[in-house]
Amino acid sequence: MKLSELLNAYSIETEFSNDFEVHALAELNKATPNDISYIDQARYLKLLKDSKAGAVFIRKKESSKVPKRMQALVVDNPHLAFAKASHAFKIPFFKNPESVNEPKHFERVTIMPNVVIGEGVEIGENSLIYPGVVIADGVKIGKNCILYPRVTLYQNTILEDNVTIHAGSVIGGDGFGYAHTALGEHVKIEHVGIVRIQKNVEIGANTAIDRAVFGETLIKEGVKIDNLVQIGHNCVLGEHSIVVSQVGLSGSTTTGRNVVFGGQVGIGGHLHVGEFTQIGGKSAVGKDLPPNTNFAGAIPAMEIHEWHHFLAHLRTNFRKQQKTSLLQKAKGFFKS
Protein backbone atom coordinates (compact mmCIF):
# COMPACT_ATOMS: atom_id res chain seq x y z
CA MET A 1 0.00 0.00 0.00
CA LYS A 2 1.31 3.43 -0.95
CA LEU A 3 1.67 6.05 1.77
CA SER A 4 -0.90 8.26 0.02
CA GLU A 5 -3.39 5.39 -0.11
CA LEU A 6 -2.91 4.65 3.58
CA LEU A 7 -3.42 8.25 4.64
CA ASN A 8 -6.49 8.71 2.45
CA ALA A 9 -8.11 5.42 3.44
CA TYR A 10 -7.99 6.27 7.14
CA SER A 11 -8.53 10.05 6.93
CA ILE A 12 -5.12 10.97 8.31
CA GLU A 13 -4.37 14.57 7.39
CA THR A 14 -0.67 15.32 6.91
CA GLU A 15 1.80 16.35 4.23
CA PHE A 16 4.49 14.14 2.71
CA SER A 17 7.13 14.36 -0.01
CA ASN A 18 7.89 10.74 -0.94
CA ASP A 19 4.96 8.45 -1.71
CA PHE A 20 6.70 5.18 -0.84
CA GLU A 21 5.33 1.65 -0.50
CA VAL A 22 4.45 1.01 3.16
CA HIS A 23 5.04 -2.55 4.36
CA ALA A 24 4.28 -2.27 8.07
CA LEU A 25 4.03 -0.21 11.23
CA ALA A 26 7.01 -0.80 13.49
CA GLU A 27 8.94 0.34 16.55
CA LEU A 28 11.49 3.03 15.82
CA ASN A 29 14.43 0.81 16.73
CA LYS A 30 13.24 -2.05 14.49
CA ALA A 31 11.70 -0.21 11.55
CA THR A 32 12.92 -0.51 7.95
CA PRO A 33 12.80 2.19 5.23
CA ASN A 34 9.39 0.83 4.19
CA ASP A 35 7.90 1.10 7.68
CA ILE A 36 6.09 3.87 9.55
CA SER A 37 6.55 4.53 13.26
CA TYR A 38 5.34 7.23 15.65
CA ILE A 39 6.48 9.31 18.60
CA ASP A 40 3.95 10.32 21.23
CA GLN A 41 6.34 11.03 24.12
CA ALA A 42 9.46 13.18 24.19
CA ARG A 43 11.51 10.43 25.85
CA TYR A 44 11.49 8.49 22.57
CA LEU A 45 12.96 11.31 20.48
CA LYS A 46 16.46 9.96 21.16
CA LEU A 47 15.58 6.87 19.10
CA LEU A 48 15.17 8.91 15.92
CA LYS A 49 18.92 9.26 15.34
CA ASP A 50 19.49 5.56 14.68
CA SER A 51 16.07 4.63 13.34
CA LYS A 52 15.72 3.41 9.75
CA ALA A 53 11.98 4.13 9.53
CA GLY A 54 10.77 5.63 6.28
CA ALA A 55 8.38 7.98 8.06
CA VAL A 56 7.19 8.87 11.54
CA PHE A 57 3.98 10.40 12.88
CA ILE A 58 5.07 13.28 15.09
CA ARG A 59 3.86 16.60 16.51
CA LYS A 60 4.91 19.82 14.81
CA LYS A 61 6.89 21.10 17.81
CA GLU A 62 9.12 17.99 17.68
CA SER A 63 9.34 17.55 13.91
CA SER A 64 12.69 19.37 13.64
CA LYS A 65 14.26 16.38 15.43
CA VAL A 66 13.45 14.04 12.53
CA PRO A 67 16.53 13.14 10.40
CA LYS A 68 16.49 14.25 6.75
CA ARG A 69 16.44 10.65 5.51
CA MET A 70 13.07 10.13 7.27
CA GLN A 71 9.75 11.81 6.52
CA ALA A 72 8.07 13.71 9.33
CA LEU A 73 4.32 13.11 9.10
CA VAL A 74 3.15 16.03 11.21
CA VAL A 75 -0.16 15.44 13.01
CA ASP A 76 -1.86 16.80 16.12
CA ASN A 77 -2.12 13.37 17.75
CA PRO A 78 0.54 10.84 16.64
CA HIS A 79 -0.97 8.06 18.76
CA LEU A 80 -4.35 8.51 17.09
CA ALA A 81 -2.81 8.60 13.61
CA PHE A 82 -0.93 5.41 14.39
CA ALA A 83 -4.12 3.74 15.65
CA LYS A 84 -5.99 4.62 12.46
CA ALA A 85 -3.14 3.41 10.25
CA SER A 86 -2.88 0.12 12.16
CA HIS A 87 -6.20 -1.02 10.70
CA ALA A 88 -4.55 -1.41 7.30
CA PHE A 89 -2.35 -4.18 8.68
CA LYS A 90 -4.86 -6.22 10.67
CA ILE A 91 -4.11 -9.95 10.46
CA PRO A 92 -7.20 -12.20 10.27
CA PHE A 93 -7.78 -15.10 12.65
CA PHE A 94 -8.73 -17.29 9.68
CA LYS A 95 -7.81 -15.85 6.29
CA ASN A 96 -10.01 -18.45 4.63
CA PRO A 97 -12.71 -19.58 7.11
CA GLU A 98 -13.83 -22.39 4.80
CA SER A 99 -10.42 -24.05 5.05
CA VAL A 100 -10.97 -25.05 8.69
CA ASN A 101 -13.32 -27.78 7.46
CA GLU A 102 -10.62 -29.36 5.31
CA PRO A 103 -8.90 -32.44 6.79
CA LYS A 104 -5.34 -31.89 7.99
CA HIS A 105 -2.72 -34.47 8.79
CA PHE A 106 0.14 -34.18 11.28
CA GLU A 107 2.74 -36.90 11.84
CA ARG A 108 2.71 -38.55 15.29
CA VAL A 109 0.30 -35.98 16.79
CA THR A 110 -2.89 -36.85 18.70
CA ILE A 111 -5.78 -34.56 17.78
CA MET A 112 -9.11 -35.28 19.49
CA PRO A 113 -12.59 -34.46 18.10
CA ASN A 114 -13.91 -30.93 17.58
CA VAL A 115 -10.51 -29.29 17.18
CA VAL A 116 -10.44 -26.39 14.69
CA ILE A 117 -7.19 -25.75 12.82
CA GLY A 118 -6.43 -22.92 10.39
CA GLU A 119 -4.03 -22.70 7.46
CA GLY A 120 -0.25 -22.93 7.70
CA VAL A 121 -0.28 -24.54 11.15
CA GLU A 122 2.67 -26.68 12.27
CA ILE A 123 2.47 -29.17 15.16
CA GLY A 124 5.48 -31.10 16.45
CA GLU A 125 5.48 -34.83 17.14
CA ASN A 126 4.11 -36.31 20.36
CA SER A 127 1.90 -33.28 20.95
CA LEU A 128 -1.61 -33.82 22.32
CA ILE A 129 -4.56 -31.59 21.38
CA TYR A 130 -7.74 -32.05 23.44
CA PRO A 131 -11.34 -31.44 22.24
CA GLY A 132 -12.51 -27.92 21.56
CA VAL A 133 -9.08 -26.40 20.97
CA VAL A 134 -8.99 -23.65 18.33
CA ILE A 135 -5.75 -23.00 16.45
CA ALA A 136 -5.67 -19.99 14.10
CA ASP A 137 -3.67 -19.49 10.91
CA GLY A 138 0.11 -19.65 11.03
CA VAL A 139 0.45 -21.08 14.55
CA LYS A 140 3.64 -23.05 15.26
CA ILE A 141 3.52 -25.72 18.00
CA GLY A 142 6.65 -27.60 19.03
CA LYS A 143 7.20 -31.18 20.17
CA ASN A 144 5.61 -32.74 23.27
CA CYS A 145 3.09 -29.93 23.78
CA ILE A 146 -0.27 -30.43 25.51
CA LEU A 147 -3.29 -28.21 24.85
CA TYR A 148 -6.21 -28.97 27.15
CA PRO A 149 -9.89 -28.42 26.16
CA ARG A 150 -10.97 -25.00 24.85
CA VAL A 151 -7.49 -23.51 24.59
CA THR A 152 -7.38 -20.86 21.86
CA LEU A 153 -4.21 -19.92 20.00
CA TYR A 154 -4.55 -16.75 17.92
CA GLN A 155 -2.82 -16.19 14.58
CA ASN A 156 0.94 -16.74 14.33
CA THR A 157 1.39 -17.72 17.99
CA ILE A 158 4.56 -19.75 18.58
CA LEU A 159 4.87 -22.51 21.19
CA GLU A 160 8.29 -24.10 21.52
CA ASP A 161 8.81 -27.67 22.81
CA ASN A 162 7.26 -29.08 26.00
CA VAL A 163 4.65 -26.37 26.53
CA THR A 164 1.50 -27.24 28.49
CA ILE A 165 -1.57 -24.98 28.43
CA HIS A 166 -4.58 -25.78 30.59
CA ALA A 167 -8.26 -25.49 29.74
CA GLY A 168 -9.78 -22.23 28.60
CA SER A 169 -6.61 -20.18 28.24
CA VAL A 170 -6.30 -17.71 25.37
CA ILE A 171 -2.90 -17.03 23.86
CA GLY A 172 -2.40 -14.18 21.41
CA GLY A 173 -5.64 -12.23 21.74
CA ASP A 174 -5.72 -8.48 21.09
CA GLY A 175 -3.89 -6.31 23.57
CA PHE A 176 -5.91 -3.64 25.35
CA GLY A 177 -4.76 -0.66 23.33
CA TYR A 178 -6.75 2.40 22.24
CA ALA A 179 -6.04 5.94 21.12
CA HIS A 180 -8.46 8.74 21.97
CA THR A 181 -10.04 11.49 19.90
CA ALA A 182 -10.55 15.07 21.09
CA LEU A 183 -14.16 14.09 21.89
CA GLY A 184 -13.05 11.22 24.09
CA GLU A 185 -13.92 8.47 21.61
CA HIS A 186 -11.75 5.35 21.65
CA VAL A 187 -10.01 4.18 18.48
CA LYS A 188 -8.75 0.61 18.56
CA ILE A 189 -5.08 -0.11 17.87
CA GLU A 190 -4.77 -3.28 15.82
CA HIS A 191 -2.09 -5.52 17.31
CA VAL A 192 -0.02 -7.09 14.54
CA GLY A 193 2.63 -8.78 16.70
CA ILE A 194 2.62 -12.27 18.18
CA VAL A 195 3.08 -14.28 21.37
CA ARG A 196 6.12 -16.55 21.66
CA ILE A 197 6.24 -19.11 24.46
CA GLN A 198 9.60 -20.77 24.91
CA LYS A 199 10.22 -24.37 25.95
CA ASN A 200 9.20 -26.01 29.24
CA VAL A 201 6.52 -23.44 30.08
CA GLU A 202 3.27 -24.38 31.84
CA ILE A 203 0.21 -22.12 31.81
CA GLY A 204 -2.83 -22.64 34.04
CA ALA A 205 -6.54 -22.51 33.21
CA ASN A 206 -8.35 -19.40 31.95
CA THR A 207 -5.21 -17.31 31.61
CA ALA A 208 -4.88 -14.66 28.88
CA ILE A 209 -1.62 -13.61 27.23
CA ASP A 210 -2.07 -10.77 24.72
CA ARG A 211 -0.09 -10.47 21.52
CA ALA A 212 2.24 -7.57 20.91
CA VAL A 213 1.34 -4.33 19.16
CA PHE A 214 4.32 -5.21 16.99
CA GLY A 215 7.14 -7.60 17.76
CA GLU A 216 6.57 -10.24 20.44
CA THR A 217 5.02 -10.81 23.82
CA LEU A 218 7.60 -13.23 25.17
CA ILE A 219 7.31 -15.91 27.86
CA LYS A 220 10.81 -17.28 28.35
CA GLU A 221 11.98 -20.79 29.12
CA GLY A 222 10.73 -22.56 32.23
CA VAL A 223 8.14 -19.97 33.31
CA LYS A 224 5.19 -21.30 35.34
CA ILE A 225 1.91 -19.36 35.23
CA ASP A 226 -1.10 -20.11 37.43
CA ASN A 227 -4.83 -19.88 36.62
CA LEU A 228 -6.61 -16.59 35.89
CA VAL A 229 -3.57 -14.49 35.05
CA GLN A 230 -3.60 -11.52 32.64
CA ILE A 231 -0.41 -10.68 30.76
CA GLY A 232 -0.59 -7.58 28.57
CA HIS A 233 0.86 -6.87 25.14
CA ASN A 234 4.65 -6.74 24.69
CA CYS A 235 5.40 -8.13 28.15
CA VAL A 236 8.58 -10.17 28.62
CA LEU A 237 8.69 -12.71 31.46
CA GLY A 238 12.22 -13.83 32.34
CA GLU A 239 13.36 -17.44 32.53
CA HIS A 240 11.93 -19.65 35.29
CA SER A 241 9.71 -16.93 36.74
CA ILE A 242 6.57 -17.87 38.69
CA VAL A 243 3.25 -16.04 38.36
CA VAL A 244 0.56 -16.96 40.91
CA SER A 245 -3.18 -16.66 40.20
CA GLN A 246 -4.97 -13.36 39.51
CA VAL A 247 -1.80 -11.43 38.75
CA GLY A 248 -2.14 -8.63 36.19
CA LEU A 249 0.84 -7.40 34.18
CA SER A 250 0.16 -4.23 32.19
CA GLY A 251 1.57 -3.80 28.71
CA SER A 252 5.36 -3.78 28.20
CA THR A 253 6.17 -5.04 31.70
CA THR A 254 9.52 -6.85 31.58
CA THR A 255 11.30 -9.00 34.14
CA GLY A 256 14.62 -10.67 34.76
CA ARG A 257 14.87 -14.39 35.47
CA ASN A 258 13.37 -16.21 38.47
CA VAL A 259 11.00 -13.43 39.48
CA VAL A 260 8.07 -14.49 41.73
CA PHE A 261 4.70 -12.70 41.63
CA GLY A 262 2.40 -13.50 44.56
CA GLY A 263 -1.36 -13.75 44.04
CA GLN A 264 -3.24 -10.64 42.87
CA VAL A 265 -0.12 -8.56 42.29
CA GLY A 266 -0.71 -5.68 39.87
CA ILE A 267 2.09 -4.13 37.77
CA GLY A 268 1.88 -0.80 35.97
CA GLY A 269 2.91 -0.67 32.32
CA HIS A 270 6.42 -0.11 30.94
CA LEU A 271 8.10 -1.20 34.18
CA HIS A 272 10.96 -3.62 34.82
CA VAL A 273 11.34 -6.09 37.68
CA GLY A 274 14.91 -7.24 38.30
CA GLU A 275 15.99 -10.87 38.44
CA PHE A 276 15.37 -13.01 41.54
CA THR A 277 12.98 -10.41 42.99
CA GLN A 278 9.88 -11.60 44.87
CA ILE A 279 6.66 -9.59 45.19
CA GLY A 280 4.15 -10.44 47.92
CA GLY A 281 0.46 -11.03 47.26
CA LYS A 282 -1.83 -8.07 46.51
CA SER A 283 1.11 -5.69 46.04
CA ALA A 284 0.64 -2.79 43.65
CA VAL A 285 3.83 -1.99 41.74
CA GLY A 286 4.21 1.44 40.16
CA LYS A 287 7.97 1.72 39.63
CA ASP A 288 10.93 -0.35 38.46
CA LEU A 289 12.10 -2.86 41.06
CA PRO A 290 15.78 -3.76 41.52
CA PRO A 291 17.09 -7.35 41.41
CA ASN A 292 17.47 -9.70 44.38
CA THR A 293 14.95 -7.94 46.63
CA ASN A 294 11.59 -8.72 48.26
CA PHE A 295 8.60 -6.37 48.11
CA ALA A 296 5.17 -6.43 49.73
CA GLY A 297 2.36 -4.03 50.52
CA ALA A 298 -1.35 -3.80 49.85
CA ILE A 299 -3.46 -0.68 50.48
CA PRO A 300 -7.26 -0.71 50.04
CA ALA A 301 -8.60 1.64 47.36
CA MET A 302 -9.75 5.07 48.49
CA GLU A 303 -10.70 8.40 46.90
CA ILE A 304 -7.74 9.86 45.08
CA HIS A 305 -7.44 13.07 47.15
CA GLU A 306 -7.65 11.00 50.34
CA TRP A 307 -4.96 8.68 48.97
CA HIS A 308 -2.62 11.61 48.28
CA HIS A 309 -3.12 12.98 51.81
CA PHE A 310 -2.62 9.51 53.25
CA LEU A 311 0.68 9.02 51.43
CA ALA A 312 1.96 12.45 52.46
CA HIS A 313 0.99 11.84 56.09
CA LEU A 314 2.51 8.37 56.10
CA ARG A 315 5.76 9.60 54.57
CA THR A 316 6.05 12.52 57.00
CA ASN A 317 5.43 10.38 60.06
CA PHE A 318 7.80 7.68 58.87
CA ARG A 319 10.61 10.23 58.40
CA LYS A 320 9.91 11.73 61.84
CA GLN A 321 10.17 8.29 63.38
CA GLN A 322 13.46 7.67 61.60
CA LYS A 323 14.90 10.96 62.88
CA THR A 324 13.65 10.28 66.43
CA SER A 325 15.19 6.83 66.37
CA LEU A 326 18.53 8.19 65.17
CA LEU A 327 18.53 10.89 67.87
CA GLN A 328 17.77 8.35 70.57
CA LYS A 329 20.60 6.14 69.37
CA ALA A 330 22.96 9.12 69.31
CA LYS A 331 22.02 10.13 72.87
CA GLY A 332 22.59 6.60 74.07
CA PHE A 333 25.99 6.52 72.39
CA PHE A 334 27.19 9.75 74.04
CA LYS A 335 25.88 8.69 77.48
CA SER A 336 27.89 5.53 77.31
Swiss-Prot record:
Some GO term, biological process aspect, for this entry: which one? lipid A biosynthetic process
User: What are the entry keywords?
Assistant: Acyltransferase, Lipid A biosynthesis, Lipid biosynthesis, Lipid metabolism, Repeat, Transferase
> Which residues act catalytically here?
H233 (proton acceptor)
Mind telling me which Pfam families this protein's record contains? Answer: Hexapep, LpxD
Q: Could you tell me what reaction this enzyme catalyses?
A: a UDP-3-O-[(3R)-3-hydroxyacyl]-alpha-D-glucosamine + a (3R)-hydroxyacyl-[ACP] = a UDP-2-N,3-O-bis[(3R)-3-hydroxyacyl]-alpha-D-glucosamine + holo-[ACP] + H(+)
A Gene Ontology cellular-component term: membrane
What's its EC?
Answer: 2.3.1.191
**What GO MF annotations does this protein's record show?**
N-acyltransferase activity
Q: From which domain of life does this come?
A: Bacteria
The biological pathway it contributes to is: Bacterial outer membrane biogenesis; LPS lipid A biosynthesis
Report the HAMAP family cross-referenced here.
LpxD
Q: Which family does it belong to?
A: Belongs to the transferase hexapeptide repeat family. LpxD subfamily.
* NCBIfam families (UniProt xref): lipid_A_lpxD, PRK00892.1
**Subunit structure, as described in the record:** Homotrimer.
Q: What is the role of this chain?
A: Catalyzes the N-acylation of UDP-3-O-acylglucosamine using 3-hydroxyacyl-ACP as the acyl donor. Is involved in the biosynthesis of lipid A, a phosphorylated glycolipid that anchors the lipopolysaccharide to the outer membrane of the cell.
Protein name, per record:
UDP-3-O-acylglucosamine N-acyltransferase
The organism is Helicobacter pylori (strain ATCC 700392 / 26695)
